Amino acid sequence: MSLVKLANTCAHLQNCSKVRVALTSIPYTKLQLQFAYNLYQQGFLSSLQKGSTMGPDKDFVEVTPDNISTRRLWVGLKYRDNKPVLSSCKLISKPNSRIHLPMEDMKKLCSGVTIRNIKPLQPGELILVRAHNNIMDINEAISKKLDGEVLCRVK
């Protein structure tokens, strides 16, 4: 998994939400799909659709090695009281210094303790973790008793 691509996606979504774009696209990869799906599940995004470079698909199109370069994920951004729901998206693990935490440290992080210079989880925030090549919310990783790499914080 490339943290550089995740950083680019975070910056893109953050920039689009600041200029009040309703619909934007990100590259179609497993990483981006899992990342966007978690944001959608947690209520930061209004919609998530597969599509091409021209826009979201009206009919189902299977992704194959021949058309993968033209496939995109179309993401609908959410706004509340004319303010973006997704206001900040920042990497915690960097490409040159990845941060892996055991489940016990993740529990402490969720309960208000600073761990390895990572500020505790605040209300309305989401910390995404990669465990066993899946991206999930930190609370989901704790409930499944998994250790993992702390990827990013979304506010």
UniProtKB/Swiss-Prot annotation:
Localization recorded for this chain is: Mitochondrion
On whether Mitochondrion is a keyword of this UniProt record, the answer is yes
Instruction: Give the matching InterPro entries.
Output: Ribosomal_uS8 (IPR000630), Ribosomal_uS8_sf (IPR035987)
Listed GO biological process terms: mitochondrial translation
Is-annotated flag, keyword Transport? no
User: What SUPFAM superfamilies does the database record attribute to this sequence?
Assistant: Ribosomal protein S8 (SSF56047)
Short name of any one Pfam family annotated for the protein: Ribosomal_S8
Q: Which Gene3D superfamilies match?
A: 3.30.1370.30, 3.30.1490.10
Primary residence? mitochondrion
Query: One GO cellular component from the entry?
Result: mitochondrion
**Keywords annotated in UniProt:** Mitochondrion, Ribonucleoprotein, Ribosomal protein
GO MF assignments: structural constituent of ribosome
Question: How does the annotation summarize its subunit structure?
Answer: Component of the mitochondrial small ribosomal subunit (mt-SSU). Mature yeast 74S mitochondrial ribosomes consist of a small (37S) and a large (54S) subunit. The 37S small subunit contains a 15S ribosomal RNA (15S mt-rRNA) and 34 different proteins. The 54S large subunit contains a 21S rRNA (21S mt-rRNA) and 46 different proteins.
Q: What does this protein do?
A: Component of the mitochondrial ribosome (mitoribosome), a dedicated translation machinery responsible for the synthesis of mitochondrial genome-encoded proteins, including at least some of the essential transmembrane subunits of the mitochondrial respiratory chain. The mitoribosomes are attached to the mitochondrial inner membrane and translation products are cotranslationally integrated into the membrane.
Similarity remark: Belongs to the universal ribosomal protein uS8 family.
What's the name of the protein?
A: Small ribosomal subunit protein uS8m
Q: What's the gene?
A: MRPS8
